[in-house]
């Protein structure tokens, strides 16, 4: 059995490796099928599912995992959102969402000008490759939660549902 993560981003791959330490986990290039900067829960979730499906279809013994970050409005305020999907070799689709945090107004302004969050965060934090390290969540929480930890939480939710699906208790 192998798990393919639909991304080459090290934070996403490491989050999956930590939750599945006894399974071979690799990252593969997988298109999300959504915009480069998803702007709703629905679009972000769809991106995760599309990535996971792509990975699962490559091999009958492969679990596909898709992890997607996006933004969404709640009551006219923009929030960071993230979704994960796990697709089994039997084509069962499991989904989960994680942390949400309000995005500062100056970052929101950049997003509304069609600048991707990853690019904005490098400028906002005056750092390079924030999306491959602590992520926006790391910057916005003063490093208390990193992008890897945020995605690890989502992968934990996916793994728990997958374990239940494979148990005799459902």
From Swiss-Prot:
EC supergroup of this enzyme: hydrolase
Cofactor field: Mg(2+); Mn(2+)
Catalytic activity of the protein: XTP + H2O = XDP + phosphate + H(+); ITP + H2O = IDP + phosphate + H(+)
Note on how the cofactor is bound: Binds 1 divalent metal cation per subunit; can use either Mg(2+) or Mn(2+).
Pfam families associated with the record: NTPase_I-T
Molecular function GO labels: ITPase activity; metal ion binding; nucleotide binding; ribonucleoside triphosphate phosphatase activity
EC number in record: 3.6.1.73
Keyword annotations: Hydrolase, Magnesium, Manganese, Metal-binding, Nucleotide metabolism, Nucleotide-binding
Job description of the protein: Phosphatase that hydrolyzes non-canonical purine nucleotides such as XTP and ITP to their respective diphosphate derivatives. Probably excludes non-canonical purines from DNA/RNA precursor pool, thus preventing their incorporation into DNA/RNA and avoiding chromosomal lesions.
Sequence similarity: Belongs to the YjjX NTPase family.
Name listed for the protein in its UniProt record: Probable inosine/xanthosine triphosphatase
Organism of provenance: Oceanobacillus iheyensis (strain DSM 14371 / CIP 107618 / JCM 11309 / KCTC 3954 / HTE831)
